[in-house]
Amino acid sequence: MAAAAAAGPGAGAGIPGASGGGGAREGARVAALCLLWYALSAGGNVVNKVILSAFPFPVTVSLCHILALCAGLPPLLRAWRVPPAPPVSGPGPSPHPASGPLLPPRFYPRYVLPLAFGKYFASVSAHVSIWKVPVSYAHTVKATMPIWVVLLSRIIMKEKQSTKVYLSLVPIISGVLLATVTELSFDVWGLVSALAATLCFSLQNIFSKKVLRDSRIHHLRLLNILGCHAVFFMIPTWVLVDLSTFLVSSDLAYVSQWPWTLLLLVVSGFCNFAQNVIAFSILNLISPLSYSVANATKRIMVIAVSLIMLRNPVTSTNVLGMMTAILGVFLYNKTKYDANQQARRHLLPVSTSDLSNREHLRSPMEKPHNGALFPQQGDFQYRNILLTDHFQYSRQGHPNSYALSRHDV
């Protein structure tokens, strides 16, 4: 298993069977984390649906999630000794240069604020979709994310995919269409909200990886920064939409349920925070392909648990559409992973002469910018393809430069 390989060379050296025992313990830890991830994700979605069915204020639920992220991440970052974000460079040369690379002067307004707005908008849209349509259908629509990623990568990054990758999108489209036409509790606004959330998550996926690559910020540190900035977008929306409704509404039926509602909101915020941290930890332990399988399994678990707990009316054709879409997501991930591995094999030199030739033919050398090296356009496209599914979260990908990111839960 990939997690066993991540233990590092020399683990258990000189002790017969130590390597196998370490691999078994690593596998057991990954399995336990996956089960906990599934339970938190499924439970959190069921709790969200229960809240929104009796308390139809999706912005309030989103605000609780963002606040839980802002309150819970800083202690973890300190406990795991996650390095702080690099300082922002000034307009001129600094008299006391920093020991490491600096961020561009307009890094926060140009990159962080748009990503924070995307996080806010995606969270609100996702909760509106869960409010309007069943959890099972909302998660089926979220399976269209690979379609959006491929389209947006082609438009924004000029990234072309192989024919196999495009063909792997067909089951996703077919499954979502089948689930939509057979959905008994269909709602147009629920579908639009789910699609908007998925589109926004896809944009975040593309640009977050670009920001992480260029800035070298730790992924959990970036998550904390985006959450704190998203609060500034969330609070005005909450005041205008939900708080104003609380103050002027004559229907006070839900006031008597405030203690129960507040408890559910706390549970929902904790589940969202915990599953975010555990998802990053799992991705840090296993290969991207194994993670994609675990993520597809998690979506199946969420749909199954929601159907059992919430008793949504479904047909066999509706379930077939859901499973087809999820199977399509797995096929897409497998095809994309194989394509990236093939590209990596072409990139690696097989002899010293190959290495010399590639060094000679390399596009103009990276330009130093505030102490950091940034690649020119020549190999940007390949690096972007390689980073799409296998990024800095994986300990196998960057064992040396990201040793500090190997935080296990």
Curated annotation (Swiss-Prot):
InterPro entries: Sugar_P_trans_dom (IPR004853), TPT_transporter (IPR050186). The keyword Membrane applies. One of its GO terms (biological process) is transmembrane transport. The keyword Transport applies. It comes from the Eukaryota. GO terms for molecular function: antiporter activity. The chain crosses the membrane at residues 50-70, 111-131, 133-153, 165-184, 188-207, 222-242, 252-274, 282-303, 312-332. The modification Phosphoserine is found at S363. GO terms for cellular component: Golgi apparatus; membrane. SUPFAM superfamilies: Multidrug resistance efflux transporter EmrE. Keywords: Membrane, Phosphoprotein, Transmembrane, Transmembrane helix, Transport. Coiled coil: none annotated. It is a multi-pass membrane protein. Pfam families: TPT. It is found in: Membrane. Putative transporter. Belongs to the TPT transporter family. SLC35E subfamily. PANTHER family: SOLUTE CARRIER FAMILY 35 (PTHR11132). This is Solute carrier family 35 member E1. It comes from Rattus norvegicus (Rat).
